[in-house]
Amino acid sequence: MIDNVITAIDRVAAEHPTRVAYDYEGTQYTYAQLKEGSDRLAGFFAETLPEHEPIIVYGGQTFDMVEVFLGLSKSGHAYIPIDTHSPNERITQVQDVAHTPAIIEVAPLPIAVPDVQIIRAPALHEAEKTHAPISSLQHAVVGDDNYYIIFTSGTTGKPKGVQISHDNLLSYVNWNISDFGLKEGVVAMSQPPYSFDLSVMDLYPTLVLGGTLKALPKEVTDNFKTLFATLPKLGLNEWVSTPSFAEIALLDPNFNQDNYPDLTHFLFCGEELVNKTAQELITRFPKATVYNTYGPTETTVAVTGMAITQDIVDQYPRLPIGFAKPDTEIFVVDEQGNQVSAGTEGELMIVGPSVSKGYLNNPEKTAKAFFNVGSQRGYRSGDLATMTEDGMIFYRGRTDFQVKLHGYRIELEDVDHNLNQVSYIKQASTVPRYNKDHKVAQLIAFAVAKPNDFESDMKLTQAVKAELGKMVMEYMIPQRIIYRDKLPLTANGKVDRKALIAEVNH
């Protein structure tokens, strides 16, 4: 257990200064460098930035980003990460909500942002080498102060800034380092972009454990040949990603324990881990433990988890997302907010110390989604789930991914889940096509097919529908299946359902 994220990382630097904190394609940075650079940057930020204001940091998967995050934390500022692969309008959308006084350019901004101080890379590099370090941590982020603010997509297209405090982060990190069996000095893959809160799953637990973050930038992950050549050289103990990214790695027949002898932990979050992906990982990595976790950004990365063993895979066609972390209570409630009985589907409510105070500068949305229970904060997740008597939770889809077709209520993710079990399908995502009255007229599935001997897509579709018909009600079978070489992913590595919906409704 740690009591402060910042001092825990500094302690590693004091005790193991030459340990490698960050490795970017073979360029290594030690904990001593991380401490000295972040201390000097903190001194610089204390002089140049207005006190306690959140600051946008624009950049990619680099050591400089981590150093800037820590420098801001030490000088009392929350950071707002924006990844270089975000669309340009994202920068202005975030700034329109956040009104930050400054943007730190770790990488060059692609557009001009008016009426804001821009701190450019040369000034950062000068400061990290020559500026006087901050003299103490008395103004550092602590307690209920915001540590980071991550923007998620809003339903109106206006993004929502989720405020995560130091105490929220501390609750998450302590659970991660105590419950997942990670060792001091762990070597962890750092693949999710910093603007996606899944990155926090590898970033802070690894640093407080004195481990090494192995950066996997998008330029590598976007090129499968490069990716498959790079991954085995990283010497990983821990893999953190969405299930979709692991499914890409599994396309390489060499992705197995023989070629990754030290890989002992898979941690998944961000989307549903399907049974056949878990089975494939368990088969290929007999020495590793596969953990399924769940949590909205609003509750700090993840709030449930469990090891997915062979017994669990055999027992549950749709895998559980685990049990609530010890300091957190999770309830399943009906539309009136009453707790439902075990096994009954309802909405997940999450109460505990890792629940956010709310959305930055958005009291209306905050009031809708968050509530107080005594001194604890609660969050209405919008996720449907069931819970067993002993507290094991099963995810059942989004309340807002429900559609009605011919009077039947259909969970798109339920259709996806079953379609992904079909023997001819590698990956699939189902979307509604609306008619001119904005009613759902058809379900359309986009799918990546496995290699097959069918003479036409029509014959393949007949076989897919026949197999799917054994798993789901007839009204849940998509009317059309469109085959693709790959499905579009969001910047966060999830299947981009919104892009597919837009495609069939243009």
From Swiss-Prot:
CDD domains: DltA. Its EC number is 6.2.1.54. The keyword Oxidoreductase does not apply. GO terms for biological process: lipoteichoic acid biosynthetic process. It is found in: Cytoplasm. D-alanine binds at D197, V301, K494. One of its GO terms (cellular component) is cytoplasm. It catalyses: holo-[D-alanyl-carrier protein] + D-alanine + ATP = D-alanyl-[D-alanyl-carrier protein] + AMP + diphosphate. GO terms for molecular function: ATP binding; D-alanine [D-alanyl carrier protein] ligase activity. Pathway: Cell wall biogenesis; lipoteichoic acid biosynthesis. ATP binds at T152, S153, N292, T293, Y294, G295, P296, T297, D383, Y395, R396, G397, R398, K494. Keywords: ATP-binding, Cytoplasm, Ligase, Nucleotide-binding. It holds the Pfam family AMP-binding. Belongs to the ATP-dependent AMP-binding enzyme family. DltA subfamily. Catalyzes the first step in the D-alanylation of lipoteichoic acid (LTA), the activation of D-alanine and its transfer onto the D-alanyl carrier protein (Dcp) DltC. In an ATP-dependent two-step reaction, forms a high energy D-alanyl-AMP intermediate, followed by transfer of the D-alanyl residue as a thiol ester to the phosphopantheinyl prosthetic group of the Dcp. D-alanylation of LTA plays an important role in modulating the properties of the cell wall in Gram-positive bacteria, influencing the net charge of the cell wall. This is D-alanine--D-alanyl carrier protein ligase. It comes from Lacticaseibacillus paracasei (strain ATCC 334 / BCRC 17002 / CCUG 31169 / CIP 107868 / KCTC 3260 / NRRL B-441) (Lactobacillus paracasei).
